[in-house]
């Protein structure tokens, strides 16, 4: 896959590809090992034909990636969208999942074609300052996601124990379960992937059960799913749509998927093998995200049926008249619309459909939190290794990430109430949306570079679609910031927001600039940024082939 693209020299410097050696030789495992220490062989089959054996060999990375579409942040976003808008935002969920699939397709393609993940490519192409800032934003996204997993798991333990396990106790339990997953990882890659498949199955069965007992109106559901409209919607519904996009398309997941696909042995000296790997990974990702979409649909439909336009007084009466009457006081006795969260959601399901519905909901929520734990650990490890060439053991990495996530969460759990914890979950969903450009812009940049991707670079249609995604995300984020400013508690906060906004816009502008260079705006390419047109300078090519 080596070779120059474009002019062989530019300003006296030779540019070219960074592709690693094409032979699928296993890499040396770093201290403590990683998911990529084991390579899955691909069976030989007749060329040009579809093979279920090959699809099975490629199956795994897409399902691990899809777990980010099912974490507790997504579950909370789903139930709130159902409670606020009924079935009206189902089409947003559908198209957000489709857009997520398009982004993940680019991530998988980058990993397959170059043999490097997005973090490694960023390390080679971006200068030091933007590279470090980019790394920090993705680490922030990972910690934010981990906090959501901690919150979801703690609430699940509280529901399963009927409140006997306090929220802070559930938060601390998540430390123990994380190291259980690290222990499980020692049993091999395929067993780990199978275990995550088992957790996804639990979510499908538990949330599917809630869907069956709730019996949503199918006609209204199909209308909300396929008719892109929202009659009678206002700012609450629009902000909820923003939350759906932020929860579904998560920035660190793009970095994660580009690394996960490297676990399969693909002979990158053969274009046919690369093309075949891209096809099978796309099929697998489509299947995985279809499953995740159905699970999210179950949750949104259940709460669209059970909670839409429900008042606090009505929820109180329902619980007071049920076998779970002890939970009734969590709903204020007023006529305001219920501000539902993942805790109240489980309670009202139990009040409406019996205690089994509450416990089954809690099991599904627990599976969502647990399944997200390990993928977040891997994402953090891959991002750190890619951006910084700093290799830590999984133990050290998970200790750092989980410590950053647990400290603020346990403080909230001890000194504040459940509503503050759920409110933090909502804020973290918005944070993911705000940080999304720092994943989508780099993946669009590098997959559009012929010098890097050669014949597998984005075509015109792909560039238009992914660029439209980026414009949509930026517009949504701008709308959120404008809507959020009036809610700041004190004018002094405006200066802090202005400072953060300046840094945010500065980094985003730089990433847009480099992205435009790869889209054909050659006049923007100066000095060291010629590499975004022609590839790495000759002196950096060998470093690019041997790094990682």
Swiss-Prot record:
Extracellular side residue ranges read 74-82, 161-164, 215-237, 305-346, 416-426, 486-493
Chain intervals for the UniProt region annotation (Disordered): 1-38
Q: Which InterPro entries match?
A: NRAMP_fam
Where would one find the signal peptide in this protein?
A: none
Q: Does the keyword Transport apply?
A: yes
Q: Per the record, what are the reactions this protein catalyses?
A: Zn(2+)(in) + H(+)(out) = Zn(2+)(out) + H(+)(in); Fe(2+)(in) + H(+)(out) = Fe(2+)(out) + H(+)(in); Mn(2+)(in) + H(+)(out) = Mn(2+)(out) + H(+)(in)
Q: Which residues cross the membrane?
A: 56-73, 83-102, 140-160, 165-184, 194-214, 238-256, 285-304, 347-366, 398-415, 427-447, 464-485, 494-513
User: Per the record's keyword annotation, is Endoplasmic reticulum included, yes or no?
Assistant: no
| Pfam families associated with the record | Nramp
Q: What spans does the record annotate as topological domain Cytoplasmic, numbered to this chain?
A: 1-55, 103-139, 185-193, 257-284, 367-397, 448-463, 514-548
Q: Name one GO cellular component term.
A: lysosomal membrane
Per the record, the GO terms for biological process are: iron ion transmembrane transport; iron ion transport; manganese ion transport
Identify the glycosylated residues: 335
Family assignment from sequence similarity: Belongs to the NRAMP family.
**In UniProt terms, what function does this protein have?**
Macrophage-specific antiporter that fluxes metal ions in either direction against a proton gradient. Localized to late endosomal lysosomal membranes, delivers bivalent cations from the cytosol into these acidic compartments where they may directly affect antimicrobial activity. Involved in iron metabolism and host natural resistance to infection with intracellular parasites.
Q: What is this protein called?
A: Natural resistance-associated macrophage protein 1
